[in-house]
């Protein structure tokens, strides 16, 4: 958005397909097009390997871009952009990925290249109609506290046990009337946590969201009063929707849970910091 405003034009972005960016950035007025980078961990994506690189060069070349900003230190992407005949290529310093600060590096890059001072507060834009439609469909009421629980996560060490969420739900419900919206993925371990919560005493006050696309969950999240999430995609989404978001940091660098002023990280008992292999759940 900052680049779009500075250059007074819409921008196209290239992002990994599994980022689901098309589902939560599709209403951003600053974005002209979202181009999917089809690469995966199994190296079987459409853009993996030498032939995949050639395909990506051809696709980018067809867009006839005249300027690009590369938010990583990859020589591969530098060469791809040059071979796609993009004349004006701006990029992080090559071969400097180690110990890069995910937020500060981007801010320094934009400041150096475009004299931009960008605040670390990403925001997701939603149509007011979608927010109101979700409010009616799911019967949101101001007499209740509507709480998003981001109970899923990309790895076992990031997922807080169901029992912890259940205890929290019981304590909240003893104070005031609450509704809980359960956001998670659909892998086996995530569904085990989901089903344990649904089988608890407060299961009747829950609405599960695992059957919805991310784009369908956003208006629901926007209607919530607060969000309590593992370090998962839903913590980032709810904070970007300006919902106060408590992030349960168990096994991920603290940076991922406090870069947005709407995030309030909680660390494991006895820990002053958290990073990979803290194993704090």
Model-derived features with residue positions:
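Catalytic machinery of carbohydrate-active enzymes
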Residues: 1-281
